[in-house]
């Protein structure tokens, strides 16, 4: 019984393996149209080892099914190894270029430099902000503010310059004087001409009061203006300039 049962069980085991191999072969044939059954040693040279070098199909019980070709792994002991040097404990003469360049950049880059200290505050006197170089003069019998004459130059004039200057003074004295303080209109509006036009609103007609405010020595030929000097000139262009006038009503 046992001898008869053993061949039957062996046939059952082989049939199961055959069915499994055929099932694997059919599944592989569905994915590979060039599937061919294994016909023995002509296709599978190492049929006994389960390898098929021709089509990379594993032969199992007479059928070739597609699997990856078996390659035994190399033991770890046989792999080539490279010795890793131990970290040196003593300092070496080598430096890391990236670190040194970074430190150099952070040290000398203008972006990372501290800002320059601010300048010390400069204090000034309020009186220096106001220019007080004007004086009251009686010009052609009118009281007006005029700018003071600049300090005379230290150099002496040559005889030619002196004669030319005297001729200019005599010419100015013979020239008829223009009343620059007269109003262009007959209006009696009072006030100070702050706009800076070439004429003023009105001036004081009282020459006696003007004579008290000014002296004869203050009056000079330079105080009289030529007719072509009616337009207002800036201080940089003229030494003498009418800034504003004072009007008094008696």
UniProtKB/Swiss-Prot annotation:
Pfam families per record: UPF0524
Region annotation (Disordered) ranges: 201-250
Acidic residues compositional bias, start-end: 202-229
Entry's Gene Ontology BP terms: circadian behavior; nervous system development
TM spans (from-to): none
InterPro entries: UPF0524_fam
Protein keywords: Neurogenesis
Domain of life, per lineage: Eukaryota
Record-stated family: Belongs to the UPF0524 family.
Protein's job: May play a role in neuronal and neurobehavioral development.
PANTHER family recorded: UPF0524 PROTEIN C3ORF70 (PTHR31785:SF2)
Protein name: UPF0524 protein C3orf70
Organism: Homo sapiens (Human)
Phylogenetic lineage: Eukaryota, Metazoa, Chordata, Craniata, Vertebrata
Gene that this sequence comes from: C3orf70
